[in-house]
C-alpha cells in the first residue's frame, strides 16, 4: 500500500518549509506572552484553515481550584484521577505526576492557582494527514514548539511541553484487516491509524480470530511511542516485540511529506521508526503490522509473603524464581513479577498454547523449591480458550492498568546474568527492596530464536535480555513535591546504578525508564544512535520535532518556565 499526496500540496509545503527556515533563527521557541507569539486572530485563522479542529487547553484539574471550583466536579475528578481513560480522552492532561509538577492537580489545595505548566497551549484534534501538514507548517512559520500525542501514556513527558502546539491523534480510529503481500512477508495483517488503543484493536482482532502483539495496558495506543519505542507484550516470547511486527508506516516528516516507510520504500525511515523512539522522526498516521491466528492460553497467578524477615528464605525463593524464569520464557511465556521486601506476586505468567496440566508440570520444579524452603503460596492456574479471554481475565483487571504515579527507573538484564551470577541479582533485589523500591521484573525472550532475521532499530540489548526491569517508588496522590523529587534523584544516583553495575552494556527500555537517565543515548539506543541521528537530520532537517531523550534532543534544552531553546554547544 502506498499513499499519495497531490503534487501541488506537496510542492507548496516544501516551498513553505524552505521559506520559513530563515524565520527559525531564534535560539528559542516562542512562548505565550512573547512578541513573536501568534495573536488571537492568527490562531483563529489557523483554526479556520484546519476546519475548526484547534483545541484551547483547559486544564483537567481546573474544577478543583478557585475561581473555577465546583465541589461535585472536583470530587468526581478525584474518584477518576487514577483511571487512564480520564486523561487519554484529554488533549492535554499529563498522567505523570513528575512531569505535571502540581500545576493543576486535583489533590493540591483549592486556593493554589491552576496554571498550564508543562501542558500544551493548544492542540489540533487531527482528522487526516493534511491536518498534520498544516500544523507542522504553522509551527515552523511561527517558531512554536511542536509535540505529538495520542493518549499521554508517558513517564518522561515526551508528548507535552510548555507553550507547545500538539498534534493530537486520538480521534484517528480506523482498523483494516488485510492480506498483506511483499517481498518480505505474505500473510494476515492489520492497518491501524494513530488514535487506536488496545481497547479498540484487541476485541476487533478477537472477532477475526486473530491476535496482535500489543501492550499489557489496554488504554495504550499501539501506533505511537509503544511500537516506535520497541513495545513489549504478553505475547513477546512467542512473536517478539511490537516493533518486530511492523510491515510499513505512513508518516508525515518534518518537510511535510506524506511518506510510506517499509523495507523497500524509504527503508532508513522504516528502520528508525521501528524501535528508534517516537516523537522525533515524523508524525505517524498509520502502521500496518502482522497478525496471528488466535490460540488457547493458560495464565498463572502466584503469590507468597515474606513472613519471617529474620531469615533469608524469602529472597532464596526469589532467586529460585529467577533461575527458573528462562525455562518459562523459552516455552513462549511472558511473566510479570512484582517484588517488594514483604511480598512476591507473579501476575500473570502468560503461556500461549499451554494447558493447565502442562503449566503445572512446567512450574513443578519452582513449586518444589518453595516446599523445601517451607514457604506457603497461593497459586491459580486458569485456562482460556483464546488470548483475548485470557487478557480480559488476568491482564486487563491488573492494578497496573491504573495511572501509576511513581519515580521510575529500569534496566534490561541479560540471560547471561541469571545463568552465571544469579546470586548477585538476588542480592541486588534484596538491597533495592530494603530501601522501599518495588522491583518489577518482566520476563521474556525476544532473541533471534523467536523473531528470526529482523531488521530494525530496537535497542540491541533486548535480544540477549532475560527480563526488562522497572523500578518504582511510591508517589501518593497529593504527596509533597519536594520529597518526591528527592526520591526521583535517588532513583538516578543510587537505585538504577545498582542494576547498571550488574549489566553495564545492556541498556534500558526507553519507555519504562528514569527520565533523568544521565547517559540516555547509550542506555536507550546503544550503537544505533549515530545512524538514528543521521536519519533524524535527513527527515527533519529543521528540527521541528522534539521530545525528551528522543533522538536529536541533545540539540535543545528546556530552560526556566519550560522554554525550549537550542543547547549551547560544547567545544
From Swiss-Prot:
Induction: Expression is correlated with the production of patulin. Expression is positively regulated by the secondary metabolism regulator laeA. Expression is strongly decreased with increased sucrose concentrations. This decrease is lost in the presence of malic acid. Expression is increased with pH changes from 2.5 to 3.5 in the presence of a limiting concentration of sucrose, 50 mM. Natural phenols present in apple fruits such as chlorogenic acid or the flavonoid epicatechin modulate patulin biosynthesis.
GO cellular component, one term: vacuole
One of the Pfam families matching this protein, by short name: FAD_binding_4
Record flagged with keyword Oxidoreductase: yes
The FAD-binding PCMH-type domain, residue ranges: 115-294
Gene giving rise to this polypeptide: patO
Effect of loss of the gene: Strongly reduces the production of patulin and leads to the production of a distinct dark-red pigment.
Glycosylation site positions: 47, 101, 125, 179, 341, 374, 380, 421, 445, 480
Alphabetized Gene3D superfamilies for the sequence: 3.30.465.10
Effect of residue 381 to I: In strain: MD-8
EC number: 1.-.-.-
Keyword field contains Flavoprotein: yes
Pathway where this protein functions: Mycotoxin biosynthesis; patulin biosynthesis
EC supergroup of this enzyme: oxidoreductase
Compartments reported by the entry: Vacuole lumen
Family: Belongs to the oxygen-dependent FAD-linked oxidoreductase family.
Cross-referenced InterPro entries: BBE, FAD-bd_PCMH, FAD-bd_PCMH-like_sf, FAD-bd_PCMH_sub2, FAD-linked_Oxidoreductases_BP, Oxid_FAD_bind_N
Signal sequence region: 1-23
Alphabetized SUPFAM superfamilies for the sequence: FAD-binding/transporter-associated domain-like (SSF56176)
Biotech / industrial applications: Patulin was originally used as an antibiotic and specifically trialed to be used against the common cold, but it is no longer used for that purpose since it has been shown to induce immunological, neurological and gastrointestinal effects. Genotoxic effects of patulin with dose-dependent increase in DNA strand breaks in brain, liver and kidneys have been detected in mice. However, more recently, it has been proposed that patulin might also have anti-tumor properties.
Gene Ontology molecular function, alphabetical: FAD binding; oxidoreductase activity; polyketide synthase activity
Cofactor or coenzyme needed: FAD
Main subcellular location of this protein, as a coarse class: other
The protein's name in its UniProt record: FAD-linked oxidoreductase patO
Functional note: FAD-linked oxidoreductase; part of the gene cluster that mediates the biosynthesis of patulin, an acetate-derived tetraketide mycotoxin produced by several fungal species that shows antimicrobial properties against several bacteria. PatO acts with patJ in the vacuole to convert gentisyl alcohol to isoepoxydon. The pathway begins with the synthesis of 6-methylsalicylic acid by the polyketide synthase (PKS) patK via condensation of acetate and malonate units.
GO biological process: patulin biosynthetic process
